[in-house]
Amino acid sequence: MNFRRVAVLVTALSILVLAAPLALAQQNSGGELSQAEINRIVAAFTAKEAQFRQALNQYSFKRDAVIQSLGMGGQVIGEYHRVSSFTFDDQGNRFEKISFFPMPSFGGVTNEDLDDLGGINPFALDPYKIDRYNFKYSGKEKIDELNLYVFDISPKVIPDPKKTKERLFIGRVWVDDQELQIVKTKGKGIPETKINRFPVVETYREQFGGRFWFPTYSYADEELVFENGSTLHIRMQVRYSDFAPARADVKVVDVETGGELQNEKAKPEAPKPTPTPKP
């Protein structure tokens, strides 16, 4: 979120995030895991994450994103609302068709925010950048019927925003101890700058087709604190729905302007999802 482009300011607190994911393996008697076990678990769930991302390339889905700036008392003073359908090509390139995008009354949404909407917020980790992260095992949690490994994740080196546009995840992930797949994430994208701050986003996944856990709901509600002491209260809700197996013959589409997808094949009915338990 870009402070300079927002007219109304409010007061507040900053954010501290963290903790991260985890996955498989047996626990030692004290809830501890050996480093070898941790390494095996991380390797297992990151490999599953790569498989999941490849599987997602065979699906189309809908994203309904609402980002609001809030004033005193929590009233909405600005809004960015964008509804889109997405499909991917064989190389994993994303194509977007915008179906609803009224003129935003909140002008603080940056290119980094849009990048995170399609990357870090729903997916957290890029499976091809796993070696860029530190993984710290934080224990196990039980949410409803799921037993979950929990890991805190942080980049080994934070990208320099003056030299690169690369974004990395910092936060926590929850991994099912049976399937060794991520079912929940909580964190944000970095780096941040003096004028660009990002909220901590909590994302839940649901199981589709009895195999992969796809993101279905992301939420954030936070007061962002900037270097000069000014604050901005942000609320974000993103819903991902209508997952359906599909393959589209597409031409390049401008994600910002929302061109039409070409020759998109008919989409069969999506498999019934299994909700992620919420604490």
Which sequence ranges carry the predicted segments?
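N-terminal secretory signal peptides that target proteins for export/translocation
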Residues: M1-R5
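Bacterial N-terminal signal peptides
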Residues: V10-A20
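Sec/Tat signal peptide C-region and signal peptidase I cleavage site
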Residues: P21-A25
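Structured extracytoplasmic
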Residues: Q26-I170, D177-K184, K188-P199, Q207-P215, ...
